[in-house]
Amino acid sequence: MARLSYVRIKYLFFSWLAVFIGSWVIYVRYNSYTELCRGQECKTAICDKYRKGIIDGSACEGLCEKETIYFGKCLSAKPNNQIYLGIWGNLEGVIKCQMENTLHLDFGVDLEPRKEIVLFDKPTRGTTVQKFKEMVHSLVKKRLGDQGNLQDLVNLILKAADSNKDGHVSLPEAKSAWALLQLNEFLLMVILQDKEHTPKLLGYCGDLYITERVPYTSLYGISLPWIIEVFIPMGLRKRMDQWFTPSWPRKAKIVIGLLEFVEDIFHGLYGNFLMCDVSAKNFGYNDKYDLKMVDMRKIIPEMSLKEYIKYKSCESDSDCVYGADCGTTCDQSKRCTTDVTQPNLAKVCLLVKDYLLSGTPSEIRDELEKQIYSCIALKAATKHMEMEHALILNNLKALLWKKISHTNDS
C-alpha cells in the first residue's frame, strides 16, 4: 500500500508539473503573440488617416471600405514590423505595416515604438508636383549617391505614386509615397520591379504595402510547430534543415537565381546595394524553383551605409557591423571605416555551400567545391574585385547550368 501511495503521489506531482509548465509556456507564447501581432491596430491607424483624407493608395479602398483585404497568419518577428499572410480579392499576398518611425538605419538598437509621432506630414499642403519631384530627387540622391539617371528613377516613383492611374499625383498619394520611400525594401522594389527575382508590389495604403506571396519562404529547412522546436537541439535542427531540400538539379536552379539577384544589385543602374542579412529565411522560391526574395529590408544602398557608419566610433571591428553581415573595420583613430570587408557574392556562397554540395553529382563535385571556396574568399577591398566578382559569378552559373540544362527537374 505504501508503495502504491508513493507511485500515486509521484504520478500526481509530475502531472501537476507538466500542467504547470505547459500552462506557463502557453501563457508566454500568448503574450508574445499579442505583442508581436498587432495587425488590427495597424489597420485601424492606417484607415483612420485614409478616412480623414491624409493618405491614399491603391489598397486603401479594399482595406478600409470594401474590406476585401484580409489579414491571415501572423509572421511578425518584431512588434514594430507587422507582417501577415493576406488575401486581396483573389490574390494571395504578404501584408507589411510599420508600427514605428523607422526612417533611419540603426546598429542593433531597437527604436522606441511610435506613440504620437506624426507620420505623413510631408509633403505639406500647397506643395506642387514639381516641388514633390525635387523632394524625391533629393531623397534618392542622398540614399543612392549622385547617379546620372536619377531622374528616370524619380519618374518611376511618381508612376508608382499615382495609385488610381489618372495621370496626377494627389497630396494624399504623395504622402503615402513619401512615407514608403523611407523604407529600403520599397525603394528596392521600385528599382527592381522588372527583375525576375523581386516580388511584385501589389498595392499600398500609407506605409502599409502588399507584395506578391512566395510559396516557399525559406531557401531550405522545414517549418515545425513551436512546441516541437523548443525540444530539438540546434545541431539536429541544422541537419534536419538539409534533409528537407529539393532535388539537386532544383537546388542548383534556385542558386542560379540567387546569383542572378546578386548581379541585379551589384553596381546596377542606381548604384550598389549591400545584403546585410544573408540568411536562408530571406530567400524563397516558387513552384517552378525560381528564386524569389522574401525579405529585402536589410538590403541597403552602399551610399546609405557609408553615410551613417562614418560617424560611428568604435573599439573593435565588431562595433562596425550593421545587420548580421555588413561590416567594416575599426581604424586607429577609433572610427569605423566606410569600406565593407565582404562583398555580397562571398556571403551568398557561404550560405549555399552545404546546401549545394550536399548531393552534388560526383563528376562536378571537385570543380564546384573549388569554385565555391574561391567565391567565399572574395574580399571587397581588393584592386580587381569587380573583375574577380564577375569571373567567379559567371563561372559558377555556367557550371551549374551546364549540369542541369538537360534535366527535367530544372
UniProtKB/Swiss-Prot annotation:
Keywords: Disulfide bond, Endoplasmic reticulum, Membrane, Signal-anchor, Transmembrane, Transmembrane helix. Among the many cysteines in the lumenal domain, most are probably involved in disulfide bonds. The keyword Transmembrane helix applies. Residues 1-5 are cytoplasmic. It is a single-pass type II membrane protein. It is found in: Endoplasmic reticulum membrane. InterPro entries: FAM69_kinase_dom, FAM69_N. Residues 27-410 are lumenal. The chain crosses the membrane at residues 6-26. It comes from the Eukaryota. GO terms for cellular component: endoplasmic reticulum membrane. Belongs to the DIPK family. This is Divergent protein kinase domain 1A.
